[in-house]
Amino acid sequence: MKKFSGIIPPVSSTFHRDGTLDKKAMREVADFLINKGVDGLFYLGTGGEFSQMNTAQRMALAEEAVTIVDGRVPVLIGVGSPSTDEAVKLAQHAQAYGADGIVAINPYYWKVAPRNLDDYYQQIARSVTLPVILYNFPDLTGQDLTPETVTRLALQNENIVGIKDTIDSVGHLRTMINTVKSVRPSFSVFCGYDDHLLNTMLLGGDGAITASANFAPELSVGIYRAWREGDLATAATLNKKLLQLPAIYALETPFVSLIKYSMQCVGLPVETYCLPPILEASEEAKDKVHVLLTAQGILPV
């Protein structure tokens, strides 16, 4: 079973202002990220706006993603849903169209008991032969995938091979890494917050799936590569810059439009339009983003 590691951007979905998929921009974003040295691309995550799409839209984007990337790096497709049936259909569709793996957030709206959660993930994992990465984002789902839960799921399902742990806690990441890897050493643990990339590597984790890699992949890629080469000084220097970027996320709720604006700032031809109910970011917020990116050397003075 393939092991995933490194920097895997959760790619922002690109739309025209009428809400249709902007395939040209999608290709340019993929080319940009691959040329920057990322280790994979994750489509239809939180910043990919999967929650505002119907099943047909998600399938169409997944097909386009696989076509555009064309085997240059692994493609992960988000399949999570409040509906187990929909998640299974999306998983099987991703496999049929050539994805390299799937990512499944736990069902949201309901807070489900362990046996319900186990059944949800077992149905997804057993419906495909693809590797499955769990996605923990308790701030949005209302329910934490605890290290004990993840260990149980990993032991029950051989193709559950990793987790994106989007939680602002070094302790949670440490316990996740130590607990799951003690029984599945090959299990991949990715942080979901930019400011925990270096922490994750120091703790024995495997990389990051973080939003800033959409517009500043050179920082997270540089940190990861420096760490792998034993150059902690370079990793620490780059990390000081990366630590400033999460301030962007506090400027709008949700912050998805500001990620797209940041991508615009670095020259990518993307609209800042997002699918409703997410409105375009304010001009005031955009100005603050521009100042921040300039201060960190991502944009020229």
UniProtKB/Swiss-Prot annotation:
Keywords: Cytoplasm, Lyase, Schiff base. Coiled coil: none annotated. Its EC number is 4.1.2.28. Disruption phenotype: Disruption mutant has reduced ability to catabolize D-xylonic acid. YjhH-yagE double mutant cannot use D-xylonate as the sole source of carbon. GO terms for biological process: aldonic acid catabolic process. The keyword Iron-sulfur does not apply. This is Probable 2-dehydro-3-deoxy-D-pentonate aldolase YjhH. It comes from Escherichia coli (strain K12).
